């Protein structure tokens, strides 16, 4: 499923896979003990997500990725997935983080529309800049 979705999203594939294939990519994340989830609609897979409940960078949960089948894009699946992951984490955590390459403005905009707020920029060990975003998980008082 991940390989199929990666092929359908070449920008994401280039950014995330680099020169790896899907299997090597998943293996590279195995040390983080995160959760890969396949999301279905009417019994058919339409999306894949990855999140960590605890990241070594700050001890907090992080959203790694959400990939949607192109035939199912713009139907609210990604927002629903982010909300479901938020609900899973809400009992134990107050916020969830995400890191996006700074030049991927459309990804930053989308996460902002899903309740993430821009927190800061950071550079990785290779000097690449990332926007770090945070999404409050506590339910708003009514």
From Swiss-Prot:
Highest rank taxon of the organism: Bacteria
GO MF annotation list: acyltransferase activity, transferring groups other than amino-acyl groups
Name of a matching Pfam family: Acetyltransf_1
InterPro entries per record: Acyl_CoA_acyltransferase, GNAT_dom
N-acetyltransferase domain mapped to chain residues: 1-138
Protein name: Uncharacterized protein YkzC
Organism: Bacillus subtilis (strain 168)
Lineage of origin: Bacteria, Bacillati, Bacillota, Bacilli, Bacillales
Gene: ykzC
């Amino acid at each position: 499923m991940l390989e199929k979705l990666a092929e359908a999203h070449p920008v994401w594939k280039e950014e995330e896979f680099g020169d790896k294939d899907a299997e090597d990519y998943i293996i590279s994340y195995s040390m983080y003990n995160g959760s890969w989830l396949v999301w279905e609609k009417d019994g058919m897979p339409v999306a894949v997500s990855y999140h960590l409940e605890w990241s070594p960078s700050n001890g907090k949960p992080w959203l790694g990725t959400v990939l949607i089948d192109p035939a199912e894009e713009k139907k609210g699946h990604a927002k629903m997935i982010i909300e479901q992951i938020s609900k899973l984490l809400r009992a134990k955590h107050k916020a969830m983080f995400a890191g996006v390459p700074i030049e991927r403005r459309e990804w930053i905009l989308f996460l902002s529309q899903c309740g993430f707020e821009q927190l800061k920029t950071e550079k990785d060990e290779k000097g690449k800049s990332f926007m770090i975003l945070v999404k409050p998980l506590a339910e708003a008082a009514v």
